[in-house]
């Protein structure tokens, strides 16, 4: 088992990574008679809720289960209100612990509910998808979507612990696994060239669900995320680099309708557009762009601009991005394999050229 700490002073917390962790009650750091609410979705509940309930029974916790519908289209204020109503109707007090059992949608939504309920209650992240294991469960970003933009309503609120059981990946659909790989590859591009090299060599092992390879990849991603969050919890600086491909990607998700493109799929296509923008700006060379394009293709991810999405469509959504300051668009762009920067003042003509180029890659 790998163990990583997110260092945030009194709000520091552990990330536990490995196979068979759902058999280890100590990782939840709960005590007997504690009240716990597991929030999950209809897909994950039959797969993993019984194991978590068994753990809670072993500890002696009082527990309840809330199942929500599955999908990005349910990451809304309406579903958030369902969680809040459940907590209120059952008269839970501030000592309740909420467990987010599921992928990124569940983690973001439940974390936001925990941040808001009685001004904040403890919650534990138990991510069951690759994307949530390597990215969204770590760092305290919680939110729901709005029709005008993704993750526009939310809070920074850190979990009490993150428990990542790699066995969950054995039930993950291939499309969801590939979507998670987009975020894994992102870490190599923005932060760690040696990890990028390793991913190029180990892609087949990862897709074969090799336990050693998966544990290493997830741990390295969480390590990078923990280092970045410890330096910049609320994204005023270096943490923005974790959004490589997300400005273009969020525009795709919003325009195409939440749930039609998986988040990781949109990030993949967005990463190619960002990399092409970087090349056109002279930040990376053609060979580096081709390596980024090739590894995303190797991971079975979409790399092309959506056919029915114009430059104007992109700009309409991108100008609502949270990195826009004083009306100026800022993009996260690679400056090499393993380094990146937030760049402002990129001419719209260059962005348009990158979007058009990526229609035929």
From Swiss-Prot:
Pathway: Metabolic intermediate biosynthesis; chorismate biosynthesis; chorismate from D-erythrose 4-phosphate and phosphoenolpyruvate: step 2/7. Its EC number is 4.2.3.4. Belongs to the sugar phosphate cyclases superfamily. Dehydroquinate synthase family. It comes from the Bacteria. This is 3-dehydroquinate synthase. The gene is aroB. PANTHER family: 3-DEHYDROQUINATE SYNTHASE (PTHR43622), 3-DEHYDROQUINATE SYNTHASE, CHLOROPLASTIC (PTHR43622:SF7). It is an enzyme of class 4 (lyase). Pfam families: DHQ_synthase (PF01761), DHQS_C (PF24621). It is found in: Cytoplasm. Keywords: Amino-acid biosynthesis, Aromatic amino acid biosynthesis, Cobalt, Cytoplasm, Lyase, Metal-binding, NAD, Nucleotide-binding, Zinc. One of its GO terms (cellular component) is cytoplasm. It catalyses: 7-phospho-2-dehydro-3-deoxy-D-arabino-heptonate = 3-dehydroquinate + phosphate. GO terms for biological process: amino acid biosynthetic process; aromatic amino acid family biosynthetic process; chorismate biosynthetic process. Zn(2+) binds at residues 183, 246, 263.
């Amino acid at each position: 088992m790998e163990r990583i700490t997110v260092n945030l002073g009194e709000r520091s917390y552990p990330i536990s990574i490995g196979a068979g962790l759902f058999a280890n009650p100590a990782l939840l750091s709960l005590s007997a008679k504690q009240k716990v609410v597991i929030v999950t979705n209809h897909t994950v509940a039959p797969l993993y809720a019984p194991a978590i309930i068994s753990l809670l029974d072993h500890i002696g916790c009082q527990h309840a289960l809330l199942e929500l519908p599955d999908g990005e289209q349910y990451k809304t204020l309406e579903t958030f209100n369902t969680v809040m109503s459940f907590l209120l109707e059952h008269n839970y007090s501030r000592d309740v612990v909420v467990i987010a059992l599921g992928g990124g949608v569940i983690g973001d939504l439940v974390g936001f509910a925990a941040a808001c309920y009685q001004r904040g209650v403890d919650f534990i992240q138990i991510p069951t998808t690759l994307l949530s294991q390597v990215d969204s469960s770590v760092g305290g970003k919680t939110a729901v979507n709005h029709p005008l933009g993704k993750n526009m309503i939310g809070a920074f609120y850190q979990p009490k612990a993150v428990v990542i059981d790699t066995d969950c990946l054995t039930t993950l659909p291939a499309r969801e696994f590939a979507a998670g790989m987009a975020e894994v590859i992102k870490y190599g591009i923005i932060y760690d060239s040696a990890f990028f090299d390793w991913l190029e060599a180990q892609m087949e092992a990862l897709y074969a669900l090799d336990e050693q390879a998966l544990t290493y990849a997830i741990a390295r991603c969480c390590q990078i995320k923990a280092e970045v969050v410890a330096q910049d919890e609320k994204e005023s600086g270096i943490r923005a680099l974790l959004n490589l491909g997300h400005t273009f990607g969020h525009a795709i998700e919003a325009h195409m309708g939440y749930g039609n493109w998986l988040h990781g799929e949109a990030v993949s296509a967005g990463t190619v557009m960002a990399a092409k923008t970087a090349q056109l700006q002279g930040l990376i060379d053609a060979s580096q762009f081709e390596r980024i394009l090739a590894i995303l293709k190797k991971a079975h991810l979409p790399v092309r601009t959506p056919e029915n999405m114009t430059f104007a469509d992109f700009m309409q959504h991108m100008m609502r991005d949270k990195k826009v300051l004083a009306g100026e668009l800022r993009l996260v762009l690679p400056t090499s394999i393993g380094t990146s920067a937030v760049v402002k003042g990129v001419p719209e003509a260059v962005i348009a050229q990158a979007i058009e180029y990526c229609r035929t890659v």
